[in-house]
């Protein structure tokens, strides 16, 4: 079977679709009446040297720490210890598999750069998109490793700096065109930090052109900080009671911000004042789409075993129409909400059901198009992606366009050894559930 796309990303005019399958990125471009493959990149980095370097550093640290504990002869002379060769640790029997993820695809604001994060070396990878190259549009600019795994990525408003948030709560800002920094902690300090895993990051500008950085974390926090003086906190947006997984800032409003995550609501904020404007409760809407996939882990179940947990995976918007779209992780439904631009109130506008579970969601801002990727494990003949166009005031599936796109995708991936897998070898597709905190995290 073909591996589902873990992530999809459209550029602003919808002419480029970027897809992640396991540890490779594919780029499909609209040409004529269909799509063609215009770029591909595989993360084939061997991280063995990186692991060995860490082992050597740890051995050196232990030698220094234990220097005073060396065995000594009766004369007080230290006993020479045999030197140990650094060995790369290998997972033992029963150890969980190690996946070489590519995650967090993003485009620069001018659409000329593609950003991605790799798990193999905890790096941000930056590509120039060269549409003049008919063979491969991906031109690697730099690969910047970080101390901890990147969780979210964007660029500054002028696209000069890479903004990256990691799983330990630190945010880094680095010039995109500068050389790779070999030792980040020594050469580049974080510009701000949370005391919790960061889940999303974005940038804002006010009417005076001042930049702000917005960060969300696992501990219900949304922080708005000045940029580049990010040590100055402008405000916090308080109201979430569970983790925040996604934040969305529409271009058609100069004050609204939307967020969601482990709560049963989609939140609407005035980011300028910090006011919570509206909470859209989707609890009743989602009930019939929940399955055994949403049962809480056994150790957190009640006696009946019917505790369910679910969360919003992604919110997106469009350029100049007051709608937002979101989906709940591991469900087969996409909700479109209408936004009152003055009050920030949210109301259900459209419900779109699909035969398979949604994995990821993106939008082409300028052409009012949504794109989803689907989990095809239960139906290997289903489309891996679907495009939905706003016609009038409703989103309509573009069946002819989708058929052309899927023909290109299937023919492209037919002989791709990475993309063709057994159903049991599919990478984990749903990650939000692991963000939820239970009693064990508070004890």
Swiss-Prot record:
Pathway: tRNA modification; N(7)-methylguanine-tRNA biosynthesis. GO terms for cellular component: cytosol; nucleus; tRNA methyltransferase complex. The keyword Metal-binding does not apply. Forms a heterodimer with the catalytic subunit TRM8. This is tRNA (guanine-N(7)-)-methyltransferase non-catalytic subunit TRM82. It comes from Kluyveromyces lactis (strain ATCC 8585 / CBS 2359 / DSM 70799 / NBRC 1267 / NRRL Y-1140 / WM37) (Yeast). Belongs to the WD repeat TRM82 family. Keywords: Nucleus, Repeat, tRNA processing, WD repeat. One of its GO terms (biological process) is tRNA (guanine-N7)-methylation. SMART domains: WD40. Residues 67-93 are annotated as: Disordered. The gene is TRM82. InterPro entries: Trm82, WD40/YVTN_repeat-like_dom_sf, WD40_repeat_dom_sf, WD40_rpt. WD repeats lie at residues 97-137, 193-235, 239-279.
């Amino acid at each position: 079977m073909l591996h589902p796309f873990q992530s999809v990303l459209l550029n602003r005019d919808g002419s480029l679709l970027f897809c992640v399958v396991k540890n490779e990125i594919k780029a499909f471009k609209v040409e004529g009446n269909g799509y063609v493959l215009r770029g591909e990149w595989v993360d084939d980095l061997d991280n063995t040297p990186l692991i060995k370097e860490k082992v050597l550093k740890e051995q050196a640290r232990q030698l220094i720490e234990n220097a005073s504990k060396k065995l000594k002869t009766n004369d007080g002379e230290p006993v020479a210890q045999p030197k140990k060769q650094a060995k790369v640790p290998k997972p033992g029997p029963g150890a969980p598999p190690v996946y070489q993820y590519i995650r967090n695809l993003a485009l620069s604001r001018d659409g000329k750069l593609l950003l991605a994060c790799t798990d193999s070396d905890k790096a941000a990878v930056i590509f120039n998109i060269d549409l003049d190259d008919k063979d491969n549009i991906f031109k690697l600019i730099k690969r910047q490793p970080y101390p901890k795994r990147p969780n979210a990525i964007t660029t500054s408003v002028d696209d000069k700096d890479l903004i990256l948030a990691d799983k330990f709560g630190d945010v880094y800002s680095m010039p995109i065109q500068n050389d790779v920094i070999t030792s980040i902690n020594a050469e580049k300090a974080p510009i701000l930090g949370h005391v919790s895993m960061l889940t999303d990051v974005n940038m804002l500008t006010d009417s005076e052109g001042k930049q702000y950085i917005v960060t969300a974390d696992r501990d219900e926090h949304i922080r708005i900080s000045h940029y580049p003086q990010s040590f100055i906190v402008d405000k916090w947006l308080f109201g979430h009671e569970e983790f925040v997984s996604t934040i969305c800032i529409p271009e058609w409003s100069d004050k609204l911000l939307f967020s969601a995550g482990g709560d049963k609501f989609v939140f609407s904020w005035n980011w300028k004042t910090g006011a919570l404007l509206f909470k859209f409760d989707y609890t009743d809407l989602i009930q019939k789409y929940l399955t055994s996939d949403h049962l809480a882990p056994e150790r957190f179940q009640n006696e009946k075993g019917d505790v369910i947990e679910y969360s919003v995976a992604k919110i997106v918007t469009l350029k100049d129409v007051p709608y937002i779209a979101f989906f709940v992780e591991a469900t087969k439904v996409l909700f479109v909400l209408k936004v009152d631009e003055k009050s920030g109130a949210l109301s259900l506008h459209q419900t779109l059901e699909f035969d398979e579970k949604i994995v990821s969601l993106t939008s082409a801002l300028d052409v009012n198009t949504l794109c989803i990727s689907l989990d095809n494990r239960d139906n290997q003949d289903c489309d891996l992606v679907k495009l939905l166009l706003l016609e009038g005031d409703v989103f309509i599936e573009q069946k002819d366009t989708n058929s052309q796109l899927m023909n290109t995708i299937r023919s492209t991936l037919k002989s791709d050894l990475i993309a063709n897998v057994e159903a049991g070898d599919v990478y984990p597709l749903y990650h939000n559930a692991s963000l939820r905190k239970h009693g064990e995290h508070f004890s």
